[in-house]
């Protein structure tokens, strides 16, 4: 789970050229001043009051956001949430696990950031359409079968940056239909601006991963002293 306290001071990044953290707007006395956020295996993001356990009524629809929105054909077993949401400033970031080696047409691996108070989507990073931060138009979907981020992510508040471990595209051990962007983001560490979702950089660890290696763990953030 992730935790957010709307009454606590809001820390801003300290590194130069970092985007500011968006203020959290919550009326005094409203419920869910302290809230817990979790996701479910059937594709929901849920916010509850940390003191009472009640749903946060101002978050999404009755405290829930449908994470299958924009994914197209997505049976429960094809798309699941296998890691906790990440609290990055006032943005809740979620990835998702796409089932391995099922078929070539699978849900996309979009990564999304949501307002911690309202549940409104702030941005989407679609590995198959990385310049567009918006939800797909009605009748359209995020690009299908793209690399996904199913393992835990990391957040550096000093830079307001999210670091994501990326998996491979579908189908994991069959590369014939992979695009140039699949080859760019598969099996890589991806750094995104937590406020905007814009890409900062990407570093690939395995080129054309045909072994389903993925990056299966949370990136570690370490400060080194330079002589």
Predicted regions and their residues:
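Repeat-blade elements of multi-bladed beta-propeller folds
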Residues: 1-44, 77-103, 108-110, 142-178, ...
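Extracytoplasmic/lumenal domain signature
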Residues: 5-16, 45-76, 110-143, 175-215, ...
């Amino acid at each position: 789970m992730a935790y957010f306290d709307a009454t606590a001071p809001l820390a801003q990044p300290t590194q130069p050229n970092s985007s500011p953290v968006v203020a959290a707007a919550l009326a005094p006395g409203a419920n869910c001043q302290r809230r817990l956020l979790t996701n479910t295996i059937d594709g929901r993001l849920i916010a509850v009051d940390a003191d009472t356990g009640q749903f946060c009524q101002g978050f999404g629809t009755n405290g829930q956001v449908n994470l299958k929105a924009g994914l197209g054909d997505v049976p429960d077993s094809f798309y699941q949430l296998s890691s906790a949401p990440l609290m990055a400033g006032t943005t809740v970031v979620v990835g998702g696990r796409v089932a391995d080696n099922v078929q070539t047409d699978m849900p996309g691996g979009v990564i999304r950031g949501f307002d911690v108070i309202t549940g409104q989507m702030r941005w989407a990073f679609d590995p198959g359409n990385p310049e567009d931060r918006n939800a797909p138009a009605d009748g359209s979907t995020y690009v299908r079968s793209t690399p996904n981020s199913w393992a835990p992510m990391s957040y550096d508040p000093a830079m307001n940056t999210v670091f994501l471990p990326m998996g491979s595209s579908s189908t994991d051990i069959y590369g014939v239909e992979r695009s140039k962007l699949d080859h760019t983001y598969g099996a890589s560490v991806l750094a995104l601006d937590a406020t905007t979702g814009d890409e900062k950089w990407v570093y690939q660890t395995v080129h054309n991963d045909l072994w389903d290696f993925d990056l299966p763990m949370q990136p570690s953030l370490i400060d080194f002293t330079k002589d």
